[in-house]
Amino acid sequence: MGVKLEVFRMTIYLTFPVAMFWIANQAEWFEDYVIQRKRELWPPEKEDQRRELEEFKERIRKQREEKLLRAAQQGP
């Protein structure tokens, strides 16, 4: 009984990961479940949203540069 049980357990231990890798590497499954879900959670950015974000980053960068420049001019 013990040897048969160990053989069964080892079969399960080896079969489960192989089956999971086989299922996960199916192109159709990946497209249906992963890519589609990703698009639902994080939709593609709109051009005007991206442009606003870039403008905001540029304003913040300029403010930091001006602050550093003022600090450098006032320093020793």
From Swiss-Prot:
Cellular location(s): Membrane; Mitochondrion; Mitochondrion inner membrane
TM region(s), chain numbering: 7-24
GO biological process, one term: mitochondrial cytochrome c oxidase assembly
Membrane topology value: Single-pass membrane protein
Gene Ontology MF terms in the entry: unfolded protein binding
Main location: membrane
GO cellular component terms attached to this protein's record: mitochondrial inner membrane
Superkingdom of origin: Eukaryota
InterPro entries the record matches: Pet100
Keywords: Membrane, Mitochondrion, Mitochondrion inner membrane, Transit peptide, Transmembrane, Transmembrane helix
Summary of the function given for this chain in its UniProt record: Plays a role in mitochondrial complex IV assembly.
Subunit structure: Interacts with COX7A2.
UniProt similarity note: Belongs to the PET100 family.
Protein name: Protein PET100 homolog, mitochondrial
Species lineage: Eukaryota, Metazoa, Chordata, Craniata, Vertebrata
Gene transcribed to yield this protein: PET100
